[in-house]
Amino acid sequence: MKKNIAILGSTGSIGTQTLDIIHLNPDLFDVYLLTANNNVDLLIRQAREYRPEIVVIANDQKYHLIQEALADLPIKVWCGAEAIADAVTAPDIDMVVTAMVGYSGLLPTIKAIEARKMIALANKETLVVAGELIMRLAQDNQVPILPVDSEHSAIFQALLGERQRPEKILLTASGGPFLHLTAEELQHATREQALRHPNWNMGAKVTIDSASLMNKGFEMIEAKWLFEMQPDEIEILVHPQSIIHSMVQFRDGSVKAQLGIPDMRLPISYALGITHRIPNDYPRVDFTATPLTFERPDLERFPNLSYAFDAIRLGGNAPCALNAANEIAVTAFLRDEISFTDMSRLLYEVMEKHELFREVSLPTFIETDSNTRRVAESLLPKFRR
């Protein structure tokens, strides 16, 4: 029986690759809902090809453009962030792929869980901001959360069939495009250089986070919530080849790893198939092509990783604040307003001013996000070039 899929963020990197898989497997999937933030032209093309029941454009100023373009089709056209959260509750949706960027994915994910939709989670910030709340909601509503990030998909696969809790998670990181740059060189690293990831094809925001290792810090927090691990039980290993996507170590010293080419369509496909492996003709790993190497991350050159560990150890609303500050920092860097290393300096100053609340609730997270963004914006002028 075919599954009806909702894709939140269908015009982004994960969204377009999800549609690639659906296109090749029309006997398995139908597209029910597509959403985008601003990319009207691509959303229109996607809607005309996949004929969803509903499309939503978050930017309400572009509503009339898509409404006119799809007027000849029986597709409901909605607009606004609240409309995305409403659309995911449609009774006929089976699975929601949460591929929106950043904090914006939080409320739609909550609404989808409350509506008891299966979640294919590509929006790691949802668990960074509100991991305890999300996992409790998922448990209360008996909703499976299937990880789309390659690392968490690898851990999920390595844990299948295991009856005992793992001793440690070994979370691998490519190291990004700046792995071997000196501290001096990092100060002059450009946006264009940061966006040239050596292994992965990803969106701009996550690519910058990968370059700063903030992405790995957020993935550590995501792993903590998904797999019920403590931060000290998660080790980060730099693995430049991105062939081993992560590993799990058990109390007898055994280690299980999941390997594959660095292609996001693999973990997306695994999540869509709900652990059923969908055949494909993608390239296979050539184990003779290159050695597999590992090294420890340099926390002096890449302090964002330390900030993530600090935030999750503090708990409460600290990870939410870190995420908000990081979104402001990355946006400023992408606009060439601050330097690469100033992103970390901005995060440090924001977190020094952060007011910690232990309460875990949606109103707390909403207030923390808003307040932290305001603080980060107020500090930006001292870093602007």
UniProtKB/Swiss-Prot annotation:
GO terms for biological process: isopentenyl diphosphate biosynthetic process, methylerythritol 4-phosphate pathway involved in terpenoid biosynthetic process. Its cofactor is Mg(2+); Mn(2+). NADPH binds at residues 11-14, 39, 123, 125, 203. Pathway: Isoprenoid biosynthesis; isopentenyl diphosphate biosynthesis via DXP pathway; isopentenyl diphosphate from 1-deoxy-D-xylulose 5-phosphate: step 1/6. The keyword S-adenosyl-L-methionine does not apply. One of its GO terms (molecular function) is NADPH binding. Keywords: Isoprene biosynthesis, Manganese, Metal-binding, NADP, Oxidoreductase. Pfam families: DXP_redisom_C, DXP_reductoisom, DXPR_C. It comes from the Bacteria. Its EC number is 1.1.1.267. 1-deoxy-D-xylulose 5-phosphate binds at residues 124, 150-151, 174, 197, 210, 215-216, 219. Mn(2+) binds at residues 149, 151, 219. It catalyses: 2-C-methyl-D-erythritol 4-phosphate + NADP(+) = 1-deoxy-D-xylulose 5-phosphate + NADPH + H(+). It is an enzyme of class 1 (oxidoreductase). Catalyzes the NADPH-dependent rearrangement and reduction of 1-deoxy-D-xylulose-5-phosphate (DXP) to 2-C-methyl-D-erythritol 4-phosphate (MEP). Belongs to the DXR family. HAMAP family: DXP_reductoisom (MF_00183). This is 1-deoxy-D-xylulose 5-phosphate reductoisomerase. It comes from Porphyromonas gingivalis (strain ATCC BAA-308 / W83).
